[in-house]
């Protein structure tokens, strides 16, 4: 494996000063460095990857056993080996119902039965006088459905959906303010029904509903496997939707965690969403690596993060309804691949997954693109753009949006030379030393890599494809890094310390044994309460 990494580093050193734009001297460059599945088009030609680099990268697939591990995942083997679990979120979108075995048992009858229960429940809510749905969850129980509900707003024909995640009381207070407690459904999304943020918010919502004339027993639902705890909370079993331990939180929007989405867009549109994910599953399993979108997206990511040393990756959807996608992918990628230990217990020998961030275009252009274009750090960018929007009467808006997206990817690659900057300053009337000074501020180094995902329109099927694409990208990158992408031990220590700090913050215990900084901060908080 290391010999491939060494060859990749040597290759990167050879091409680091090469102009990406010069690669387009080959008239076939754009077509050769693009791929497509269905209507989803991936262009990675604006990177400094050439045939030699791509072939070296593909060597990582063989060396890591990616194909075999992909088969293991889809066949229900426990590839989440630190927890001894299968990884089968793909089964949630297996609408054809073909057998998927875990420990010799076909899980699909249970998956399809739960899906049908969801359909009946969701349609019942849609047919009732419920006007608002409040989903209470955090992490994967919030980011996925919140992102998908926003993304598919043109397809909403059900109750309004709201999402509460933060334990900060301001979040639930602001959300519940103005809602009719008698016409609100509250969904509590917590697999264990013990997540402290979620349960704190759930108890507050229950008290609010009771105080304002609602009936929590009839107006609460739970997405959980803890039947005893949901019953103790007062939620009838017919209003509880469980899922198995082989569905990780950040991969769970396809099942019961997606109930709020199903209520918003309806069961038929939700099925289309599932079919989009299933279509990407089939593409990922069947397509040759050179035409395989998840594999190519992963290899480009590895080139930039692990070979070129780029520490972050910007996700830039030129689609306002995908404004929450960067946050969703931040959890999906950073919680999955932000690891420093390989599966066998050895240290990861290359950089792990990058920092993932971003914002919707064109908003980001007026916020952080300055750094992307002229900063000292190279930030690989991933653009997403639809050929058309959902508002035909606003087509001129969408055309301007698309023009901005394509212009940004071109500008990142092309840059602006000092000669061009000087010419502009001459036209502006500058001369002498001031001309030179002003020109330098207008130079763009260029050679900043980007990829673009393009699609006809953001509909449920396409959203399903896009989410599954990124899920499988995470899998491939994790396999190449030799890590388990499906645990998240890094979130545990802070939660444990928060539990021990709670009585100290409450003023019920001394700060003995705490470091000076923590003790000082607790003291400040206690002293400054009203």
UniProtKB/Swiss-Prot annotation:
Alphabetical UniProt keywords: Cytoplasm, Gluconeogenesis, Glycolysis, Isomerase
Catalyses which reaction(s): alpha-D-glucose 6-phosphate = beta-D-fructose 6-phosphate
InterPro entries on file: G6P_Isomerase, G6P_Isomerase_C, Phosphoglucose_isomerase_CS, SIS_dom_sf, SIS_PGI_1, SIS_PGI_2
Top-level enzyme category: isomerase
Domain of life assignment: Bacteria
EC number: 5.3.1.9
Keyword Isomerase belongs to the record: yes
Involved pathway(s): Carbohydrate biosynthesis; gluconeogenesis; Carbohydrate degradation; glycolysis; D-glyceraldehyde 3-phosphate and glycerone phosphate from D-glucose: step 2/4
Protein name: Glucose-6-phosphate isomerase
Taxonomic lineage from the root: Bacteria, Pseudomonadati, Pseudomonadota, Alphaproteobacteria, Rhodobacterales
């Amino acid at each position: 494996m290391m010999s491939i990494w060494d060859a990749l580093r040597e290759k990167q050193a050879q091409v680091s000063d090469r102009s990406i734009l010069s690669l387009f001297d080959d008239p076939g460059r754009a077509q050769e460095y693009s791929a497509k599945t269905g209507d989803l088009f991936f262009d990675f030609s604006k990177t400094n990857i050439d045939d030699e680099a791509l072939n070296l990268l593909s060597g990582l697939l063989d060396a890591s056993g990616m194909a075999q591990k992909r088969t293991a995942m889809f066949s229900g083997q426990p590839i989440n080996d630190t927890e001894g679990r299968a990884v089968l979120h793909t089964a949630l979108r297996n609408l054809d119902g073909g057998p998927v075995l875990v420990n010799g048992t076909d899980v699909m009858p249970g998956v399809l039965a739960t899906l049908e229960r969801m359909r009946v429940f969701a349609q019942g809510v849609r047919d009732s006088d419920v006007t608002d749905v409040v989903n209470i969850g955090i992490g994967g129980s919030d980011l996925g459905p919140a992102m998908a509900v926003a993304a598919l707003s043109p397809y909403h024909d059900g109750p309004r959906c709201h999402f509460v995640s933060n334990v900060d009381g301001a979040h639930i207070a602001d959300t519940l303010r103005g809602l009719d407690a008698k016409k609100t459904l509250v969904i509590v999304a917590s697999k264990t029904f013990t997540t402290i943020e979620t349960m704190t918010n759930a108890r507050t919502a229950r008290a609010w509903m009771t105080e304002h004339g609602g009936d929590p027993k009839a107006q609460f639902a739970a997405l959980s496997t803890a039947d005893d705890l949901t019953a103790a909370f007062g939620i009838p079993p017919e209003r509880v939707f469980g899922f198995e331990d082989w569905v990780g939180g950040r991969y769970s929007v396809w099942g019961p965690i997606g109930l709020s989405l199903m209520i918003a867009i309806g069961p038929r549109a939700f099925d289309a969403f599932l079919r989009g994910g299933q279509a990407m599953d089939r593409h990922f399993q069947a397509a040759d690596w050179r035409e395989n979108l998840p594999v190519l997206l992963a290899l480009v990511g590895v080139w930039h993060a692990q070979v070129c040393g780029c520490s972050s990756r910007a996700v830039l959807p030129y689609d306002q309804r995908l404004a929450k996608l960067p946050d969703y992918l931040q959890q999906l990628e950073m919680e999955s691949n932000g690891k420093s230990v390989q599966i066998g217990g050895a240290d990861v020998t290359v950089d792990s997954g990058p920092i993932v961030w971003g914002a919707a275009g064109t908003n980001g252009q007026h916020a952080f693109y300055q750094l992307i274009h002229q900063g000292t750090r190279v930030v690989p960018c991933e653009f997403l753009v639809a050929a058309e929007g959902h508002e035909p009467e606003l087509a001129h808006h969408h055309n301007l949006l698309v023009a901005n997206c394509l212009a940004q990817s071109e500008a990142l690659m092309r840059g602006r030379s000092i000669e061009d900057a000087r010419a502009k300053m001459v036209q502006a009337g500058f001369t002498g030393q001031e001309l030179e000074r002003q020109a330098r501020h207008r130079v763009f180094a260029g050679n900043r890599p980007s990829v673009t995902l393009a699609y006809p329109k953001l509909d449920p099927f396409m959203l399903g494809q896009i989410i599954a694409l990124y899920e499988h990208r995470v899998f491939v990158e994790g396999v190449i890094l030799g890590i388990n992408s499906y645990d998240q031990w890094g979130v545990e220590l802070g939660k444990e310390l928060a539990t021990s700090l709670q009585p100290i913050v409450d003023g019920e215990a001394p700060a003995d044994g705490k470091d000076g900084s923590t003790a000082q901060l607790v003291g400040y908080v206690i002293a400054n309460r009203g």
